[in-house]
UniProtKB/Swiss-Prot annotation:
GO terms for molecular function: 4 iron, 4 sulfur cluster binding; electron transfer activity; metal ion binding; oxidoreductase activity. The eukaryotic PSI reaction center is composed of at least 11 subunits. [4Fe-4S] cluster 2 binds at C21, C48, C51, C54. This is Photosystem I iron-sulfur center. Gene3D superfamilies: 3.30.70.20. It comes from Oltmannsiellopsis viridis (Marine flagellate). The keyword Metal-binding applies. Pfam families: Fer4_7. The keyword Hydrolase does not apply. Apoprotein for the two 4Fe-4S centers FA and FB of photosystem I (PSI); essential for photochemical activity. FB is the terminal electron acceptor of PSI, donating electrons to ferredoxin. The C-terminus interacts with PsaA/B/D and helps assemble the protein into the PSI complex. Required for binding of PsaD and PsaE to PSI. PSI is a plastocyanin/cytochrome c6-ferredoxin oxidoreductase, converting photonic excitation into a charge separation, which transfers an electron from the donor P700 chlorophyll pair to the spectroscopically characterized acceptors A0, A1, FX, FA and FB in turn.
Length: 81
C-alpha cells in the first residue's frame, strides 16, 4: 500500500523528519530556498508505512512534511465516511 508524502517549501532543512523515519523514505537534497541549503525529499514513498513520525518530528508551525494515507489505510483505520 503506498501513501503520498508531500514536502512543502516551508522546510527549514533541519533533518528531524529524515531521522524520525523508520523506513528511510526521506532523505535530504540540496536546495537554495532555505538557510540550511537542503530540503527533505521522499524518493522511496513505496516504503512508507504511514506512521507519520516525520510529521511529529517536524518543528515548523506549518508541518513541512505531510503523509497522506492511501484510501485503503484510511478505511481500515475507520477514518473514512
Amino acid at each position: 500500500m503506498s501513501h503520498s508524502v508531500k514536502i512543502y517549501d516551508t522546510c527549514i532543512g533541519c533533518t528531524q523528519c529524515v531521522r524520525a523515519c523508520p523506513t528511510d523514505v526521506l532523505e535530504m537534497v540540496p536546495w537554495d530556498g532555505c538557510k540550511a541549503s537542503q530540503i527533505a525529499s521522499a524518493p522511496r514513498t513505496e516504503d512508507c508505512v504511514g506512521c507519520k513520525r516525520c510529521e511529529s518530528a517536524c518543528p515548523t508551525d506549518f508541518l513541512s512534511v505531510r503523509v497522506y494515507l492511501g484510501s485503503e489505510t484510511t478505511r481500515s483505520m475507520g477514518l473514512a465516511y
